[in-house]
Amino acid sequence: MANVTLGGNPIEVGGALPSVGAKAPAFTLVGKDLKDVSLADFAGKRKVLNIVPSLDTPVCATSTRKFNEAVSKLENTVVFSISADLPFAAGRFCTTEGLDNVVPLSTFRDAGFKQAYGVDIKTGPLAGLTARAVVVLDANDNVLHAQLVPEIKEEPNYDAALAALK
């Protein structure tokens, strides 16, 4: 079990973040139209998994916008914005913001994702949500970069995540 902080207060996070060089765990989450979306649906594409507690928070919204802008300049790359938000809310956010390179996905039907990716918040006021993390995958779903952000209120290391795609 990993530990992160929320405003400096310790929070326990269950599961283990996938290791660089490992094959990413398969998953099936819920898209904005309530249909299942799997990692395999994007076979052959590079992926940035922007895992956030909720798109209704400023830092989560900012990271989603920044990754959308960054991958607009890259070929064969998609951003998954993964949270426990309901698919309707996540879809509305991406549509309203014009985030064409982001696929919003919800964990609300599958808590297994949180454990498989080491982002299952177990304690504190955000228990049940996903911790902030970024996992970058190549076109064959090998992990190129993985960061569990140590302070939930802080943004991820964009430069390190995007450098993994170069």
Curated annotation (Swiss-Prot):
Active site (catalytic residues): 60 (cysteine sulfenic acid (-soh) intermediate)
InterPro entries tied to this protein: Redoxin, Thioredoxin-like_sf, Thioredoxin_domain, TPX, Tpx_CS, Tpx_Peroxidase_subfamily
- Cite the EC number: 1.11.1.24
Query: Which residues pair up as cystines?
Result: 60-94
Gene3D superfamilies linked: Glutaredoxin
Supply the enzyme class, top level.
oxidoreductase
Q: Which Pfam families match?
A: Redoxin
What reaction gets catalysed by this protein?
a hydroperoxide + [thioredoxin]-dithiol = an alcohol + [thioredoxin]-disulfide + H2O
Signal as UniProt keyword:
no
Can you provide one Gene Ontology molecular function annotated for this UniProt record?
thioredoxin peroxidase activity
Query: What keywords are annotated for this sequence in UniProt?
Result: Antioxidant, Disulfide bond, Oxidoreductase, Peroxidase, Redox-active center
Query: Which ranges carry the Thioredoxin domain?
Result: 18-166
State its role. Answer: Thiol-specific peroxidase that catalyzes the reduction of hydrogen peroxide and organic hydroperoxides to water and alcohols, respectively. Plays a role in cell protection against oxidative stress by detoxifying peroxides.
Quote additional remarks. The active site is a conserved redox-active cysteine residue, the peroxidatic cysteine (C(P)), which makes the nucleophilic attack on the peroxide substrate. The peroxide oxidizes the C(P)-SH to cysteine sulfenic acid (C(P)-SOH), which then reacts with another cysteine residue, the resolving cysteine (C(R)), to form a disulfide bridge. The disulfide is subsequently reduced by an appropriate electron donor to complete the catalytic cycle. In this atypical 2-Cys peroxiredoxin, C(R) is present in the same subunit to form an intramolecular disulfide.
HAMAP family cross-referenced by the UniProt entry: Tpx
Family statement: Belongs to the peroxiredoxin family. Tpx subfamily.
Q: Kindly state the subunit structure of this protein.
A: Homodimer.
Q: Tell me the protein's name.
A: Thiol peroxidase
**What is the species of this protein?**
Ralstonia nicotianae (strain ATCC BAA-1114 / GMI1000) (Ralstonia solanacearum)
Q: What does the organism's lineage look like at the top? A: Bacteria, Pseudomonadati, Pseudomonadota, Betaproteobacteria, Burkholderiales
